[in-house]
């Protein structure tokens, strides 16, 4: 587990995406990623504008947005990212052969490679998925892009553990610049081989322990102390009866204090 500061890691990181993210985390004093699963552009933009000051990263499932358009959804989203200084992570979870994911990432309705700083992929189809996604990014935009591999999940009964997780780590090693880290529940090592992977952890809650659909929550202190760099929080920020401003600052503060404790 890394006890170096975000700023120290940013200065040495081989990925411009990871370096930018680590720097803005240091500047804003936040390691909070907001996961906003809402159905309309209006809901999304309103929540993003409210939570923007507290987050380093916005996680989208863009295919949930019923009225999606590049001009109506993506352009104002990017303006808000600039206004509040956060980055965008489209949680697409690619899981096909290289040529197919290349097209899925760059083409179709969503054109993800054009606007998402970061996306993610399963390791189930092998290292070709990394190659395909990287090619799509290079052919689509001059802006740097980063990929997270899904090493572990927070849902009950997940098959992503043991040999599967280790195999995914080996796939990540095939591209030091493009693969910036993992969706995982703990540190994934690699430092002795020269890797500095960012660990982003979903299933983080200060109040709830889970839901009826198999989600399992862990506390902020627990995930950061076991190696998480970025806490991913969804309904805890904006569910019914919650004030996103209050919860945004609450989770930002909890995440930052846990990080400072880890660095001591």
Swiss-Prot record:
The active site is at 93 (proton donor). Keywords: Decarboxylase, Lyase, Pyrimidine biosynthesis. It catalyses: orotidine 5'-phosphate + H(+) = UMP + CO2. Transmembrane segments: none annotated. The keyword Lyase applies. Coiled coil: none annotated. Substrate binds at residues 37, 59-61, 91-100, 217, 235. One of its GO terms (molecular function) is orotidine-5'-phosphate decarboxylase activity. GO terms for cellular component: cytosol. Pathway: Pyrimidine metabolism; UMP biosynthesis via de novo pathway; UMP from orotate: step 2/2. Belongs to the OMP decarboxylase family. This is Orotidine 5'-phosphate decarboxylase. It comes from Torulaspora delbrueckii. The lineage of its organism: Eukaryota, Fungi, Dikarya, Ascomycota, Saccharomycotina.
